[in-house]
Amino acid sequence: MNRGSLFLIAALSIASLLIAFFATCFGTISINQMEAWRQWLSLPTSEWDQQTRILALRLPRIVLAWLAGGALATAGAVMQTLLRNSLATPFTLGIASAGSFGAFLVLAMPGLAIFGSMSSPLYSLLASLLCLLLVLKISNRSNRADGLLLAGITLNFLFGAGVMLVRYLADPFQLASMERWMLGSVNAVNINTATAPLPWIAIGLAFILPRISALDQLAFDEEIAAARGVPVKRYKTQLLLASGLLTAGVVAYTGPIGFVGLLVPHAVRWFTGLRHGALIPACFFSGGIFMILADLVARTTEIAGRNSELPIGIVTAIVGGPFFLLLLIRKN
């Protein structure tokens, strides 16, 4: 990694921390940040004023937005390399549809909620991991070069059909909860909820980071990588599982927030090039920045006088849609 790449990663890491810090100031109600932080760090909860309580509500969602954005952007970069498809996203293999199906089962059938408030994220996570394992199993049995992609698309349709069936059978109250889930949210209740995806993100990154040089070789040519001693099949399976864990861990707690895993890796490549040693860390920090800013727009935007925030999934789609069209035009 050259000096310019190191400087870029350092700048992005500092920028992400500064943006996260200052994002706590803004919302429908502005606060005196320094006073709120002073009380939050030095006074017991019972002595906090309104500003500090608002800070305590905003901080978990900023943490969750940073983790979710970083994980989805990293997973998107890995998926684009492994599938050799610049339009691949973390949701290409059906993980988001499977996660939504698992969460919707709990919302539609409260009897399944045996784990309390953690039931919906847990079922979502299990369904996502099941989808990922099925994709790998089916693709390993296929002799087609595009077997992995086709298996993912097929399961995406199947779980999507399951989602539509559950929504059709749900009552209006359950349907409203499902709609909120589909729009995505980083509205974490507390810091424990905000950091709940962290173990899955840590496991995913622990598999990806030691294999960055292998990603460079896989991106160039798999046959040459195999000739150089890279265990191509094993590494591809491990990296797919890692990116799946990143995605599943996030979707279970935020719902499917689109375009982050597509937009951020392409934007970062304009500055880092194709080397994954710079691309992966830069994607993580840039994804965190993008998601924090999207959440900031979401919670400061009021539409048609409604006393509610704009769903973050709508914000990312508004930004990501035109970028997607631009990417298609450039590819043509």
Task: Label the model's feature ranges.
Residues 1-332:
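Alpha-helical transmembrane segments in inner-membrane proteins
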